[in-house]
């Protein structure tokens, strides 16, 4: 399996309408490094989530509808990477956040998340479009387009373009 296309981890569940201001608050951004901002991510929604994810050595965020709505703040994905978030599974994403996540090598997967609970074992196979929870298949969907899978397998758009400078996305 290619790097970044098969992801496993414990789940950390958030709700609906998780906007980028909640995971990357303006209150902490000015002049602060990403590690500092990551310590305060989601604190008004799920206090201590950053330390819980760190305690597990990383994890998978699970959300409902509209994850990453509001701003196109690219730092939001940097904060999630700093927190060792391996992927985000949500019912829907803000489109700008979705693209920022892909461009920064952070896997995102849209599916019904209603059956996924906190602390469960999740396995996500992006190449096949399969999501397993606690060892059973929860979701089969269309895999992400090959161009997106290629970007994710390289760790983001910049590493991808450095390796393939003449790539045509047409």
Residue map of PLM features:
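N-terminal, positively charged, Ser/Thr/Ala/Gly-biased leader segments
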Residues: 1-26, 159-170
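Feature captures the catalytic cores and cofactor-binding loops of soluble hydro-lyases/lyases
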Residues: 24-128
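Conserved phosphate/anionic-ligand binding catalytic regions in large, soluble enzymes, centered on
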Residues: 18, 68-74, 152-162
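Acidic, glycine-rich flexible loop/linker segments
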Residues: 102-170
